[in-house]
UniProtKB/Swiss-Prot annotation:
Glycans are attached at N116, N403. It comes from Arabidopsis thaliana (Mouse-ear cress). Its main location: secreted. Residues 1-22 form the signal peptide. This is Purple acid phosphatase 22. The lineage of its organism: Eukaryota, Viridiplantae, Streptophyta, Embryophyta, Tracheophyta. It catalyses: a phosphate monoester + H2O = an alcohol + phosphate. Substrate binds at N208, H329, V330, H331. The keyword Nucleotide-binding does not apply.
């Protein structure tokens, strides 16, 4: 049985490129890099794959996995190392995927917590101590942003560069582990990102590589993703883990699902409409959106794949004066002007593709020529981005290219919040009322 399971695992890994729901024409890409598989070096009762995520106002969700099913879903925490004056009990789950069975996946919500404060915590009543820092409640606040991570040497370089400078929240617009039905790669990915994801909240949305539909064998989509990466959808009144929102300081961030229904009759559309309507731009001057398949793209890779979603939802984002839209999917970097309905518009969001995390498929090297006048910067390189929101009016965006041991600043721009632009709001909602 073990040999058959091993054979099956490698078979699934070989087949995954052919069963992916994101097939595109052959592209000019760098040669694929081998996967960096991170093995488990802890006991069955020790927590592993620890990561944290925001879970509503002043709360954090701690997720960890144990191989021992007897370990309780508890987290002890406090402001001093080894001294835990808080304790919370959560829930647990597990799942099966053909012959694979996951460990016990624990989700524990802790709080209330103080802003901009370091907490020390222990999971399951055993194992090593971790620490995290809560985001600030006021400006400035900084987000590290990258999509399409995977787990290769490229990925390791990206994570190292991100970790070399402080930030408050990590944003990932889809395509996490690139497990593609090979479930042990989900475990390896969790161990790979734990040094970062256990210290700062990781807020993610799904990409096509999280679908993991397999004919006959597995019809439930996003099974692994939903079990392992529980996001604050209930806290933001969403009925699905595939789309949700959260607030940090004065920034409202919306995570959308490119691979679930998005037409005007869908739950996601109705939720998004209600969510954006509740944002008070006086207290929350910035609105940022993340999704996987880009709505604007001048690369030959995945050309037009986000068009249906753009046609369905773009007006909602435009009418709400969303400031920036981040996407992944295309394994390159590209920054657009403020745009709406395929035209430059000073009241539309800036669109940025940041699908350059380092996955095994390599880079999408073929940009269309001549470049679109809407595209201001584009490059096929691995790297990551940082959005530092200085105050209610100004933010600084920078893209850092991977260059072996260094992280080089390759693109940057200052952004003005649309909440401060009186010309972008109807007279009934003048700037004085924002």
């Amino acid at each position: 049985m073990k040999l058959f399971g091993l054979f099956l695992s490698f078979t699934l890994l070989f087949l995954c490129p052919f069963i992916s729901q994101a097939d595109v024409p052959e592209l000019s890409r760098q040669p694929p890099r081998p996967i960096v598989f991170v093995h488990n070096d802890r006991s069955k009762s020790d927590p592993q794959q620890v990561h944290i995520s925001l879970a509503g106002k002043d709360h954090m969700r701690v997720t960890f996995i144990t191989e021992d099913n007897k370990v309780e879903s508890v987290v002890e925490y406090g402001k001093q190392p080894g001294k835990y004056d808080g304790k919370a009990t959560g829930e647990c789950t597990s799942y099966k995927y053909f012959f694979y069975k996951s460990g016990k996946i624990h989700h524990v919500k802790i709080g209330p917590l103080q802003a901009n404060t370091t907490y020390y915590y222990r999971c399951g009543g055993n194992g090593p101590e971790f620490s995290f820092k809560t985001p600030p409640s006021t400006f400035p606040v900084e987000f590290a942003i990258v999509g399409d991570l995977g787990q290769t040497e490229w990925t390791a370089a990206t994570l190292s560069h991100i970790n070399s400078q402080d930030y408050d929240v990590f944003l990932l617009p889809g395509d996490l582990s690139y497990a593609d039905t090979h479930q042990p790669l989900w475990d390896s990915f969790g161990r790979l990102v734990e040094p970062l994801a256990s210290k700062r909240p990781w807020m993610v949305t799904e990409g096509n590589h999280e679908i993991e539909f397999f004919p006959i064998i597995e019809h439930t989509t996003f099974k692994s993703y939903n079990a392992r990466w529980l996001m604050p959808h209930t806290e933001s009144f969403s009925t699905s883990n595939l789309y949700y929102s959260f607030d940090v300081a004065g920034v409202h961030t919306v995570m959308l699902g490119s691979y679930t229904d998005f037409d005007c009759e869908s739950d996601q559309y109705q939720w998004l409409q209600a969510d954006l309507a509740k944002v008070d731009r006086k207290t929350t001057p910035w609105v940022v959106v993340l999704l996987h398949a880009p709505w604007y793209n001048t690369n030959e890779a995945h050309e037009g794949e986000g068009e249906s979603m753009r046609e369905a939802m773009e007006s909602l984002l435009f009418n709400a004066r969303v400031d920036v839209v981040f996407s992944g999917h295309v394994h390159a970097y590209e920054r657009f002007k403020r745009v709406y309905n395929n035209k430059a518009d000073p009241c539309g969001p800036i669109h940025i593709t940041i699908g350059d995390g380092g996955n095994r498929e390599g880079l999408a090297l073929s940009f269309k020529k001549p470049p679109s006048p809407l595209s201001e910067f584009r490059e096929s390189s691995f790297g990551h981005g940082r959005l530092k929101v200085m105050d209610g009016k100004r933010a600084h965006w920078s893209w850092h290219r991977n260059n072996d041991s260094n992280s080089l600043l390759a693109d940057e721009v200052w952004l003005d919040s649309l909440s401060t632009s009186s010309s972008c709001w109807p007279s009934s909602r003048s700037n004085d009322e924002l």
